[in-house]
Regions:
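N-terminal subdomain of nucleotide-sugar transferases
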Residues: 1-62, 108, 162, 194, ...
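Carbohydrate-associated surface elements
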Residues: 173, 195
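Conserved donor-binding/catalytic core segment of Leloir-type glycosyltransferases
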Residues: 204-233, 245
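Nucleotide-activated donor-binding/catalytic signature segment of Leloir-type glycosyltransferases, i.e.
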Residues: 257-278
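A short, well-ordered alpha-helix in the C-terminal region of glycosyltransferases
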Residues: 268, 347, 354, 361-375, ...
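Acidic donor-binding loop of glycosyltransferase active sites
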Residues: 285-300, 317
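Short hydrophobic beta-strand element within catalytic cores of glycosyltransferases
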Residues: 309, 314, 318-321, 331
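Conserved acidic donor-binding segment of nucleotide-sugar-dependent glycosyltransferases
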Residues: 330-334, 338-345, 354-360
Length: 424
């Protein structure tokens, strides 16, 4: 019997390694969650071989709908989902309802009563339908734009929060933001930091005589790479010697390359493209300073708790970032790194220059950051906090009672096995 189910839109995902680490650690701590992914991974990287055997994948969308429609035609669905299909099938995001109807008997087969989703998006809305049609309880972890930006879908963010047993956020900033907008959720929103495996980030050994600035993230507005490049232009004008490597990929790549060329920074600022997690670690270990100039984007979204800042701290790299969302909960200005206001590249350049010119200060801040990361962000500690919430606030089987479950897909239609239980 599984203690609960993790429900993901797409798992594993190389750009969401913190989710993989949490799921793996939850299993190590004895909770025996059932891992369910609604879609197959596009970019699992080196994670796939480590955990893919543990993941149960839903069929492709058309096949899943066909299976549900066949069960309805044969009158093998409980009354509530049977009636819901014609009412909602043409609505936007109706696939979430079909996923819930298809998934419900699979969950019952494994004794699962509670579902935890990551992100207030596709998986959380499927979990909402599981509750609405079948009475399963759910919780979810909200991360950044999924909670900060409203959706125009039938299942709104407000409905997700109202229906959840509890909601997890990465930061106190996000917790207070949600409680202000959803007063009914006060007392049900909890802060649990994302976790990292500290042993995967050995202390750094900066490489090369030329100081190296490293930044990592998708090439999107909220990462502030345009401001970082502008800060690098200021550094060049001040005669500071450096190399800046920006690791990632995304829709702004062409614009960023144009900005680098226009500023004649091609010899010192490099867009190095996407890299594997192991390669990112090597770049961090060789860095003199890590920089992430986060900004709010035009839709009001922003980073909340950038995992890569945790990883830089764990490596002992001094950090320069901005005062936005939960970043000040990671970095206290002048203690673990330097913070500036968003969209002030000249001030960002000042902080970078101080790091690059005063190696004693940089080394001290790097050591402080590593100690802070050990205390706040170890995956063992953060997963234990989520496990406590699941046991205390949801119908979840505690670790001592969890048993290994048969993860094979049932050969007999699971709808037939539990139909009577849900006839109303």
């Amino acid at each position: 019997m599984n203690s609960f189910a993790y429900l993901f839109e797409r798992f594993p995902s190389f750009v969401q390694t913190f989710v993989y680490r949490e799921a793996a650690e939850m299993m190590r701590q004895g909770m025996n969650p059932w891992l369910v992914s609604l879609r197959r991974p596009e970019d699992p990287g080196e994670l796939a071989e480590q955990i893919s055997a543990e993941v149960f994948y839903a069929p492709e969308e058309k096949e899943l709908r066909a299976q549900v429609d066949a069960e309805r035609a044969a009158r093998r669905l409980p009354r509530k989902p049977h009636r819901a299909i014609p009412r909602h099938r043409s609505q936007p995001d109706a696939q979430r309802m079909f996923e819930a109807i298809w998934l419900a008997p699979q969950l019952r087969e494994r004794g699962v009563r509670h579902v935890h989703a990551h992100f207030g998006g596709v998986a959380a809305r499927t979990a909402w339908w599981l509750q609405e049609l079948f009475g399963f309880s759910y919780s979810f972890t909200g991360h950044a734009n999924d909670i900060f930006c409203a959706t125009e879908l039938p299942v709104s963010n407000e409905m997700l929060v109202r229906g959840a047993k509890f909601v997890v956020t990465e930061t106190d900033f996000a917790r207070l933001w949600m409680e202000e907008r959803y007063p009914h959720a006060v007392g049900r929103v909890f802060r649990v930091f994302n976790g990292i495996a500290m042993d995967g980030f050995p202390p750094r050994e900066p490489a090369g005589a030329v100081p190296r600035i490293v930044s990592v993230g998708r090439y999107v507005e909220k990462k502030g790479f345009s401001d970082l490049i502008e800060a690098c232009r200021f550094l060049r004008l001040r005669g500071v010697e450096f190399i800046c490597e920006i690791i990632g990929g995304g829709p702004l790549e062409s614009a960023l390359r144009g900005q680098i060329a226009a500023a004649e920074l091609g010899d010192c600022v490099q867009l190095v493209g996407p890299r594997s997690q192991a390669e990112v670690r090597r770049h961090l270990a060789a860095a003199h300073v890590f920089a992430l100039a986060c900004v709010p984007d035009q839709d009001g979204g922003s980073d909340n708790l950038p995992t890569v800042i945790m990883e830089a701290m764990a490596t002992g790299v001094p950090v320069v970032s901005t005062r936005i969302a939960g970043v000040p909960e990671m970095i206290t200005d002048g203690v673990e790194g330097f913070l500036t206001e968003p969209r002030h590249p000249a001030a960002f350049a000042d902080a970078l220059e101080r790091m690059l010119r005063d190696t004693a200060v940089a080394e001290h801040l790097g050591r402080q950051g590593r100690e802070s990361a050990l205390g706040k962000f170890s995956v063992e500690k953060t997963t234990r906090a989520l496990k406590h919430l699941l046991v205390q606030h949801a119908p979840v089987i505690p670790p001592t009672a969890a048993r290994a479950a048969d993860r094979e897909i049932p050969t007999v239609s699971p709808w037939t096995r539990w139909l009577r239980r849900f006839r109303r």
